[in-house]
């Protein structure tokens, strides 16, 4: 399915972009009986890979919105010019770095143009893949570590919604996700999500207008945690969570 992300991304106004869905048989009945689980998984993951920005560019899909770059810094959090993380911002048709002041224009067909100097990444997806490679390198070299105080909320049920529990401390590194602290009612909260159990992380940008959130779940409960001091960290969590998972699994 291509086109959907261009329509619903957290930007306004809404865009009228064609959506195209292709149905593909990944494996026949006979292949399912013969192939290993690993090979079937590989085929599924391969079939689910797609690049909306390249699709837009190659098919000349025009997005004329004057706000087409709004919030794109949520994805493009690292500056390719100075290497600074979490100082990117965006408005209108531009994305820019608040640290070194490098700036790029996003044209109507999804191509990026540096306002000064050479354009290192022509497409948003190329920039995104570079960020992922940088995050993986950081994990592999043992340099990755994150910590911050977070507001934790417990999802009670669909009728009641979320209940605020208090402020605790969160760390994320080769030990996995660790949440620890004293809740507002005086009880101690401690939860660990080891790397080998966490292949991916569900993130929510500005969840219900209450801030960026991570969805932490067990078989019994669901909590949303909101980092209090770090900004625009969510996309990097996607990369580092996956990288830490594979690094840990390969060691076992």
Where are these regions (language model features)?
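Cys/His-rich short segments
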Residues: 61-118
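Phosphoinositide-binding peripheral membrane targeting modules
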Residues: 157-211
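A broadly conserved sequence feature marking short terminus-proximal activation segments
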Residues: 18-85, 223-227
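Acidic, Ser/Thr- and proline-rich intrinsically disordered linker/docking segments
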Residues: 194-252
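Short, surface-exposed beta-strand/loop "edge" segments at domain boundaries and coil↔beta transitions
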Residues: 103, 160-163, 184-190, 219-233
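Structural motif
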Residues: 94, 101-103, 174-178, 222-223
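Short, small-residue-biased leader/transition segments that mark boundaries at the very start
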Residues: 1-7
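Anionic N-terminal interaction surfaces
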Residues: 112-170
């Amino acid at each position: 399915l291509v086109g959907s992300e261009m329509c619903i991304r957290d930007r306004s106004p809404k865009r009228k972009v064609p959506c195209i869905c292709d149905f593909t048989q990944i494996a026949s009945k006979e292949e399912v009986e013969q192939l290993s689980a690993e090979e079937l998984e590989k085929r599924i993951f391969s079939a689910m890979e797609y690049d909306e920005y390249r699709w837009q560019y190659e098919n000349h899909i025009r997005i004329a919105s004057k706000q087409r770059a709004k919030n794109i810094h949520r994805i493009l959090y690292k500056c390719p010019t100075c290497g600074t993380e979490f100082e990117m911002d965006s408005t209108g048709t531009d994305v820019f770095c608040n640290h070194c002041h490098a700036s790029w224009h996003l044209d109507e067909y999804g191509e990026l143009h540096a306002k000064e100097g050479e354009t290192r990444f022509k497409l948003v997806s190329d920039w995104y893949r570079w960020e992922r490679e940088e995050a993986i390198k950081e994990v592999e070299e043992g340099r990755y570590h994150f910590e911050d105080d977070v507001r934790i909320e417990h999802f009670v049920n669909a009728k009641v919604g979320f209940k605020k529990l208090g402020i605790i401390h969160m760390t994320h590194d080769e030990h996995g996700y660790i949440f620890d602290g004293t809740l507002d009612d005086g009880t101690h909260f401690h939860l660990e999500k080891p790397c080998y159990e966490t292949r991916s992380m569900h993130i929510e940008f500005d969840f219900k207008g209450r801030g960026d959130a991570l969805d932490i779940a067990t078989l019994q409960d669901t909590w949303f945690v909101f980092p209090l001091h770090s900004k625009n960290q969510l996309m990097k969590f996607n990369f580092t969570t996956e990288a830490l998972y594979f690094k840990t699994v390969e060691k076992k």
